[in-house]
Structure formats: structure tokens, C-alpha cells
Swiss-Prot record:
Lineage: superkingdom: Bacteria
InterPro entries assigned to the protein according to its UniProt record, in alphabetical order: Alkaline_phosphatase_core_sf, DeoB, Metalloenzyme, Phosphopentomutase_DeoB_cap_sf
Cofactor note: Binds 2 manganese ions.
EC class name: isomerase
HAMAP family in the cross-refs: Phosphopentomut (MF_00740)
Name assigned to this protein: Phosphopentomutase
Reaction(s) catalysed (UniProt annotation): 2-deoxy-alpha-D-ribose 1-phosphate = 2-deoxy-D-ribose 5-phosphate; alpha-D-ribose 1-phosphate = D-ribose 5-phosphate
Organism: Clostridium perfringens (strain SM101 / Type A)
GO cellular component annotations of the record: cytosol
UniProt KW keywords: Cytoplasm, Isomerase, Manganese, Metal-binding
UniProt cross-references to Pfam families, sorted A to Z: Metalloenzyme
Keyword flag Hydrolase: no
Length: 396
């Protein structure tokens, strides 16, 4: 019989807790998402993360370590090459990514790809550079509305992003164009991790706002993950936020899209009221998309405080045979130069009301510790070719 009937893993997207040993290879020097956020604000109140021991793992201004934190804590290192969303999440579920996904940050996309995209979609392309979503809309949003051209851009991540104004370009047309882009970028030389549909509203510079109708078209995972094992063995695999997109639906039995990170936590609280056996995997993207990339430490701090209030409600709802794991998929230090992710350790905070002990675990060498622990709990073997060692027997 399983130790835990339900396991909830919440990914606070981009909440790194200090530079990994190899971070300088990624251009990241002295980065520290959580530490630098706390240093950027006058007050910082996260009592529930505090009692789960986050400040015991990592010094945080305004947040003291606690003598007896609930549950277990560890700093997790990333084994894979990269610092992006897909690499982080895929590794959590057992995959070891040894070749980074293709990026076009410095060059933009090849003309041959753009020509094919224009021929297949019927839209001319503007942009074709690395930019923040808000900047590119201010620069080209009015042009798109006037011409029907398609805004294509990228970032430091392995992504091809297409913007479309919902009312003039149309949501279905945007999705159609993204599906064509996904098909074209399955070629090895153009193989990006994700195509992202970026719909927006507004009619003039300074007023454009991206909507919650974003859609990600990810590559299928390179191999079987713990999610596949769970689903194939008739366990529930419920996703919240962009998890279903990240895994291209592989191993998911129920997907729930979120309008915001606060909404994602509300959805999680509703799911906690249901009887199920298996895994609920939650991604809260606003931390990364709204505050990390936009280099807004104050906004990030406020979002963490809102999250912490809802975390308190999650802790109250946990059953004796539930396990909660809180983690992140990479860093995105909002005080660092540029607008890109940062290569950092991430937190592993694990708690169940049935735990008698507490304390810090040794630093796991891979995010796949999470997937291995979940598989172990449900009596499943890790899929062939995956990595990760369970810490289930240490959670007592």
C-alpha cells in the first residue's frame, strides 16, 4: 500500500535559491532569485514558507530561520544542461537532458524558416529577434493591427513566440499559425522546445496587455517519464497551469489551465476537496512571466506573499496521507542584468501532517529526486533511461 494516497507538487516557476556551482558557464554570476528579492523590499512576509523551513535552507532578509521547521528541506541541483522550463520540469519527472534545446537568441530565426512560415500561414513576419513580450508589443502591436502581419520573436529560452491581437488577428488564427510553426520546427536544425501563442488586447502603444489565452506547443518528452508510469498504472495525474503543455499531454489524465498563479492555487484548493489517488502537478507561471523576466523584484515579492496566504490554506487541507512538495524549475533573478532565466539551486520542501520528524536532507544532485520519490511511493519502477533517487524513506 502507498505511504501517501495523494502527492501535490507545486512549482513556483523560477524561484531559485542561489547560484549553482556551474552558473558562470551560463553567464550567471552571484545570482540569487529569492535572496535578492528579499533584499529589494522593506518588508517580506512569507510565514508558511518560513515554517516549512525555506529560510533554514538559504538566508533571506526579513525571514528568520525557524528552530523546528515542519517537514524536510533540501537544495536541489539540476543535472541537465540548461536553465529553461522544459528542461527543469522534464528532469523532475526523470529525464536527463544532455543536449540543450536550440536557441536563436542572438541571431533570430533563419530566413528559410520565416519564408516557409509566411508561405504556409499567409502572413508576413515582423520582429524576428529576442525581446521581452511587453517591449515587442509596444514596438510592433500597432503595426500588426494595421497590417495583419505576424509578430515572431524569441528569448534566451528555446522558444518561437507568435503574437496576435485577439480581436483583429483572431485567437483561432493565432493557434493555427502556431500549429504550423510547431510542424516546421520539428526539423533538427530548427527544433525549438516550445512554440508559444501570445494573444493580446489593446489598440495602441502603452495599452497592450497579454491575455490568459496563451498556449504552448511543446516537443513531446524524449522518453517515458514518471507521469507515463502513473497514468499507465491507473493513477490520477492531474495538472494545473502549463504542466499539460510542457509535457505535450503525455502522462496527464486531467489538465486544468490557469488564468493566473492565484487562480492556479484556487484550482489546487478545489482539487484537494476531491477524492483521488495519484499525483497533482501544479505550475505557477506568473512569478517567472510577470516578475522575473520583467525584472520586477517588488512585484515578485508581492506575488510570493499572496502565494503564501494560499499555501496556508493548502497546509490546512492536507490529509494525513497527503504529501506536499514545493519546488521550482530554474531561477530568474529579477535584479540581474538582461531578462533571462538564471542557473540556480531550487528548493525542495516536503511536508505531510503524518510526519513525526523534520530536518534538512543532503543536496540532491538532480531535480529527478521528485519523480523518483513519487514513483517509489506508488510502487512503480522508474522508466528505463531515467535518473533520480527516491528520498521517500527519509520522509518520516
Amino acid at each position: 500500500m502507498s505511504k501517501y494516497k495523494r502527492i501535490f507538487t507545486i512549482v513556483i516557476d523560477s524561484l531559485g535559491i542561489g547560484a549553482m556551482n556551474d552558473s558562470e558557464k551560463y553567464g550567471d554570476v552571484n545570482v540569487d532569485t529569492l535572496g535578492h528579492i528579499a533584499e529589494s523590499v522593506d518588508t517580506f512576509n512569507i510565514p508558511n514558507l518560513q515554517k516549512m523551513g525555506i529560510a533554514n535552507l538559504h538566508p533571506i532578509k526579513h525571514v528568520a530561520p525557524v528552530e523546528n521547521p515542519i517537514g524536510y528541506q533540501a537544495k536541489m541541483a539540476e543535472a541537465s544542461v540548461g536553465k529553461d522550463t522544459m528542461t527543469g520540469h522534464w528532469e523532475m519527472m526523470g529525464l536527463h537532458i544532455t543536449k540543450p534545446f536550440k536557441t536563436f537568441t542572438d541571431t533570430g530565426f533563419p530566413q528559410e524558416l520565416l519564408d516557409e512560415l509566411t508561405a504556409r500561414t499567409g502572413h508576413k513576419i515582423v520582429g524576428n529577434k529576442s525581446a521581452s513580450g511587453t517591449e515587442i508589443l509596444d514596438e510592433l502591436g500597432e503595426h500588426q493591427i494595421a497590417t495583419g502581419d505576424m509578430i515572431v520573436y524569441t528569448s534566451a529560452d528555446s522558444v518561437l513566440q507568435i503574437c496576435g491581437q485577439e480581436e483583429t488577428f483572431g485567437l483561432e488564427e493565432l493557434y493555427r499559425c502556431c500549429e504550423i510553426a510547431r510542424e516546421l520546427t520539428l526539423k533538427d536544425e530548427w527544433k525549438v522546445g516550445r512554440i508559444i501563442a501570445r494573444p493580446y488586447l489593446g489598440t495602441k502603444k502603452g495599452e497592450f496587455k497579454r491575455t490568459s489565452n496563451r498556449h504552448d506547443y511543446a516537443l513531446k518528452p524524449y522518453g517515458r517519464t514518471v507521469l507515463n508510469e502513473l497514468k499507465d498504472n491507473n493513477f490520477d495525474v492531474i495538472s494545473v497551469g502549463k504542466i499539460k503543455d510542457i509535457f505535450d499531454g503525455e502522462g496527464i489524465t486531467e489538465g486544468n489551465k490557469s488564468k493566473s498563479s492565484v487562480h492556479g492555487m484556487e484550482q489546487t484548493l478545489e482539487i484537494m476537496d476531491r477524492d483521488f489517488t495519484g499525483f497533482c502537478f501544479i505550475n505557477l507561471v506568473d512569478f517567472d512571466a510577470l516578475w522575473g523576466h520583467r525584472r520586477n523584484p517588488q512585484g515578485y515579492a508581492e506575488e510570493l506573499e499572496k502565494f503564501d496566504v494560499n499555501l496556508g490554506k493548502v497546509l490546512e487541507k492536507l490529509h494525513e496521507d497527503d504529501l506536499l512538495i514545493i519546488t521550482a524549475d530554474h531561477g530568474n533573478d529579477p535584479t540581474y542584468t538582461g531578462t533571462d532565466h538564471t542557473r540556480e539551486y531550487v528548493p525542495f520542501l516536503a511536508y505531510s501532517p503524518s510526519m513525526k520528524g523534520h530536518g534538512q536532507l543532503e543536496t540532491p544532485k538532480t531535480f529527478a529526486t521528485i519523480g523518483a520519490t513519487i514513483a517509489d511511493n506508488f510502487g512503480l519502477k522508474m522508466p528505463e533511461g531515467t535518473i533520480g533517487e527516491s528520498v521517500l524513506n527519509k520522509l518520516v
